[in-house]
Regions:
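ATP-dependent helicase/translocase motor core
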Residues: 1-297, 306-322, 341-345, 351, ...
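Short beta-strand/turn micro-motifs composed of small residues
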Residues: 172-173, 302, 391
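Conserved helicase motor
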Residues: 305, 326-335, 350-355
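Short amphipathic alpha-helix with an adjacent loop that forms part of the alpha/beta core around
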Residues: 336-339, 380-381
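Walker B catalytic acidic pair
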Residues: 349, 392-394
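Conserved ATPase-coupling elements of RecA-like P-loop NTPase cores
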Residues: 356-361, 394-395
Length: 395
């Protein structure tokens, strides 16, 4: 198959997945016109031409981390009459409800020439995924190199058009398909030794690779799945200003943890080997559970003080300030009883938890001697609450 035939086959496949093909969007003007329609519809607003131009000036930035944040949050914009418009770029509450469109051979001018992109997926008019294709026999790594070259070209589309919102790159020669997140230059390198990390091949739950473009599209590019990949399973590492995509087995583990809890189906056991990213899996499960109103607390329990610090630092690396330090058992008890959203995810050692809950513990006996309520009595109201407890290293 020629590259053109592979491209057409992918567009047809996306059509089967209920994407809308937009052959009319061929350049920057068409991209912006479509984005404006989608933006106004989503936010139930009509912008003047000058407001729309100002909006573009505000949201378009070469900083990938900034655009990734803008894409996931409620933002504000001052209108010509001085009133504030709170808006989102996509439906962040339910990504499945966004419009999913596909464009091909989009041409964007740079300082010295132009760049042409094989296939782009637009989510609510935002170019969120770029797919570069090669013919069979040509390594997809050539497509990776092309993306890196495009990003280094002065005045490229990723720095001064809506392409700054690309979250994900996919490269394929039809039989071999890889994907990786967009990032700022310091986290986005490709060298002669063909090292490019982190780059992924998608996999099924049994970890068998899904490499053929048709199968990949079916599994990964289904609208709701792609929405989840971007919104749930891409982590914005604030401390490093970096986008990090979870590996397939981590995604399945998180899904199973969340399902198990939501269906109230008892306990579970996640078996990940050393260095496989257990902390990220636990962090993601905790943050997704944080938004479940039926759950009072999510406790992540480790067995040593140094692990407590290490895990807390890792969690805070993924999301700044998401976990506070429990300096002592009293702090832990206070946070367990707190209704504050910030205290919903707690990292603690099994020793501190034991001191609080064990009626016969030294701490509880000392409090009793001093005529104060035992921690175990203070925590009694939690008996009827739904608590999620994740034990690390529970072998």
């Amino acid at each position: 198959l020629t590259e053109q035939e592979i491209e057409q086959s992918l567009i047809d496949k996306l059509g089967d997945l209920k994407y809308t093909y937009r052959p009319d969007i061929r350049d920057r003007a068409g991209l912006e016109r479509n984005f404006r329609e989608k933006f106004e519809e989503l936010n139930r607003v009509h912008l003047t031409d000058s407001e729309f131009q100002r909006l573009l000036d505000e949201i378009i930035t070469p900083d990938v981390f900034t655009t990734a944040t803008l894409l996931r949050e409620i933002n504000s914009f001052t209108r010509d009459d001085g009133t504030t418009l709170n808006y989102t770029l996509v439906n962040i509450k339910d990504w499945c409800k966004n419009t999913f469109e596909v464009v091909n051979q989009l041409r964007i001018n740079t300082d010295n020439s132009f760049q042409r992109y094989d296939v782009m997926i637009l989510i609510n008019g935002i170019p969120a995924v770029q797919i570069e294709l090669k013919t069979l026999g040509i390594s997809p790594r050539r497509a990776m190199q092309q993306i890196v070259d495009y990003k280094n070209d002065p005045g490229n589309g990723y720095t001064r058009t809506l392409l700054c919102f690309v979250q994900l790159f996919i490269v394929s020669n039809r039989t071999d398909t890889w994907y990786f997140t967009n990032n700022n230059a310091r986290h986005f390198a490709f060298n002669a030794e063909e090292r490019f990390l982190p780059i992924y091949q998608f996999a099924a739950e049994d970890n068998s690779k899904i490499t053929h473009l048709d199968d990949f599209a079916e599994q990964f590019l289904a609208k709701c799945t792609l929405g989840r990949m971007i919104s749930r399973y891409t982590v914005l590492v604030a401390s490093e200003q970096k986008l990090l995509m979870m590996r397939p087995y981590q995604i399945y583990a998180v899904q199973r943890i969340v399902e198990c809890i939501e269906q109230n189906s008892g306990n579970g056991y996640i078996w990940h080997t050393t260095g496989s990213g257990k902390t990220l899996t636990s962090f993601k499960a905790s943050t997704l559970l944080k938004d479940n109103h039926d759950i009072h607390k999510c406790l992540f329990v480790v067995d040593r003080k140094d692990l407590d610090r290490q895990t807390r630092e890792e969690f805070n690396r993924f999301q700044e300030g998401c976990v506070e330090e429990n300096t002592n058992t009293a702090t832990l008890v206070r946070r367990l009883l707190s209704e504050d959203y910030a205290d919903k995810v707690i990292v603690t050692t099994i020793q501190k938890l034991g001191l609080a809950l064990d009626e016969q513990s030294k701490r509880n006996k000392n409090r009793q001697k001093r005529g104060r309520d035992k921690y175990s009595d203070l925590l009694a109201p939690l008996r009827d609450k739904r608590m999620v407890i994740i034990f690390d290293e529970c072998h």
